[in-house]
Regions:
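Extended boundary segments
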Residues: 1-11, 74-79
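Amphipathic, hydrophobic secondary-structure cores in small proteins
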Residues: 14-70
Length: 79
């Protein structure tokens, strides 16, 4: 795992709760992510990883993202 200050969603270990710090995707993609619940300060749980994808639980819903998009979501471990 990378250091907390530089961690992206794809780096989060399975089962870990993380807090979204900021998004670095294009504005229209960031807007859609926020609509899905991936907004700044939201707490997300990494449920499963595989085949270059990640499944997260956000707002009591499981959402699948590809690794490229998950690398655009910067997080820190939630306390």
């Amino acid at each position: 795992m990378t250091t907390d200050a530089h961690m992206t969603l794809i780096d989060a270990p399975v089962g870990t709760f993380v807090r979204i710090r900021h998004l670095t995707s294009r504005p229209e993609i960031s807007t859609r992510l926020r609509e899905l619940g991936f907004c700044e300060n939201a707490v997300v749980r990494c449920v499963m990883k595989g085949y270059g994808n990640i499944i997260c639980e956000v707002c009591n819903t499981r959402v699948g993202l590809d690794s490229g998009l998950a690398r655009r979501i910067h997080v820190s471990v939630s306390e």
